[in-house]
């Protein structure tokens, strides 16, 4: 039964969830909030939804770029290099991003008679992003249930697994990860040394997947 909406960025995690739950998904939603990499990743989200016959929409959140502070919104040169869990990567946090996107997605889901909102946060996000942690997901799920007539649910099946685990799921599903985007710098090709690139490389290697991604370094 197609009773779900998915927040789909075009990155490894959400594309894996898209294919993992394709038989349940009626609508894919991407958010353009003016980050360095939105223009690179959203086309992948749209294309994968098209291939699966799932309606896709993009919602513009320009106010985030105008009023919020994050290196993710300040140009490629502002993105720090290093491992995803390093303290300097906290500069890439867009405050309450998932809370904002989930709130909008919950409203869209109820408006379209859908029961669930899917999001692909994972265990590797916990160190940096408060709105990816289990306590937050539990809280916003409860808020969604209490705040909608149809008792909409927030479903985040990857919350307590690693990106490597997600890559293994994708491998079993036959996903070509070269048709996803991770790099926060948002240039012509993946940079290779920012936190998301490092994490991507590690996950693919640990999952035994040939990495066909083109990296600058």
Show where each model-derived region lies.
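Poly-acidic low-complexity segments
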Residues: 60-63, 176, 190, 211
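Local cysteine-cluster metal-coordination motifs and their immediate loop/turn environment
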Residues: 103, 179-202
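Short cysteine/histidine-rich metal-coordination sites, predominantly Zn2+-binding motifs
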Residues: 186-187, 209-217
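Short Cys/His-rich "knuckle" micro-motifs
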Residues: 204-207
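ATP-dependent adenylation/nucleotidyltransferase module used to activate substrates
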Residues: 1-174
């Amino acid at each position: 039964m197609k009773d779900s909406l998915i927040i789909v960025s075009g990155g490894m995690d959400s594309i894996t969830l898209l294919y993992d739950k394709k038989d349940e998904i009626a609508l894919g939603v991407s958010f353009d909030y003016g980050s360095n990499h939105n223009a690179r990743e959203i086309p992948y989200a749209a294309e994968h939804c098209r291939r699966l016959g799932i309606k896709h929409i993009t919602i513009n959140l320009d106010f985030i770029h105008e009023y919020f502070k994050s290196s993710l919104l300040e140009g490629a040169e502002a993105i720090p290099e290093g491992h995803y869990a390093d303290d300097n990567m906290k500069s890439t946090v867009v405050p309450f991003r998932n809370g904002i996107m989930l709130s909008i997605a919950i409203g869209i889901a109820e408006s379209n008679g859908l029961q669930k909102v899917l999001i692909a946060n994972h265990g590797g996000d916990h160190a940096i992003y408060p709105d990816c942690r289990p306590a937050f997901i539990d809280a916003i799920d409860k808020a969604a249930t209490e705040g909608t007539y149809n008792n909409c649910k927030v479903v985040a099946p990857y919350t307590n697994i690693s990106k490597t685990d997600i890559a293994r799921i994708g491998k079993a599903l036959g996903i070509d990860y070269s048709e996803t985007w991770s790099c926060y710098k948002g240039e012509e090709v993946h940079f290779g040394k920012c936190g998301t690139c490092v994490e991507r490389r590690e996950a693919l290697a640990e999952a035994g997947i040939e990495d066909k991604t083109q990296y600058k370094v």
